[in-house]
A protein has these predicted regions:
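Active-site anion-handling motifs in enzyme catalytic cores
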Residues: 1-189
Length: 189
């Protein structure tokens, strides 16, 4: 059985720790497959990380545009948000030209508006896309017809219990934290 070369383009974890949860889940899923996979990992475009600081000098170098010898590119996270998908045309064109299959795994949108879906569909419909494993039903319903194979999946962060070894803490059994700047919902008093 041929070894597969797979490029996983995950979310940038330094500015959004939540991205690490699905990135690690995807790594776990791929390592659990019976076929030997050479997994290469990178994060989405770094200009996103710096855009919050209004940086115009952020690096626009994208290693994804220079890949060679990849059997699959795996796209994950909210990559079907219109602000993200606009940037991926050159990578999708190169994948199509090189015969590299594109998989959207643990993938979703961002705002889920009609405008976003229309814009994303307009770009994605130009390409032959291999597989969609959505992280939510809205994404599945919006894009399932654009892929050769489509599955109404879950976010790969749900696989954390399969690979993360926890330790006992001297705390209540359920403690919830959020990592954003706004106040989260109160689940318990």
């Amino acid at each position: 059985m041929k070894e597969l070369n797979v490029l996983h383009v995950g979310g940038y974890s330094s500015t959004n720790i939540g991205n690490a949860f699905y990135n690690l889940g995807i790594r776990h899923v791929l390592k659990s497959l019976p076929q030997k996979i050479n997994l290469y990992e990178t994060s989405d475009k770094q200009v996103y990380a710096w855009s919050r600081y209004n940086s115009t000098s952020a690096s626009h170098f994208d290693p994804c545009e220079h890949f060679t010898d990849m059997d699959y590119i795996i796209w994950s996270g909210p990559m079907m948000g219109k602000q993200y998908v606009r940037e991926w045309g050159p990578v999708l064109e190169k994948a199509e030209m090189m015969g590299t299959k594109v998989i959207c795994l643990s993938a979703g949108g961002n705002q889920y508006t009609n405008e976003e879906v229309e814009e994303v569909r307009k770009l994605l419909s130009k390409f032959h896309l291999y597989a969609l494993f959505s992280r939510d039903s809205e994404t599945y319903e919006s894009y399932r017809d654009l892929f050769e194979h489509s599955y109404n999946g879950i976010c790969c962060a749900f696989y954390i219990p399969e690979y993360f070894q926890s330790w006992e803490l001297d705390m209540e059994p359920y403690v919830v934290f959020i990592f954003v700047q706004y106040r989260g919902p109160c689940f318990v008093d």
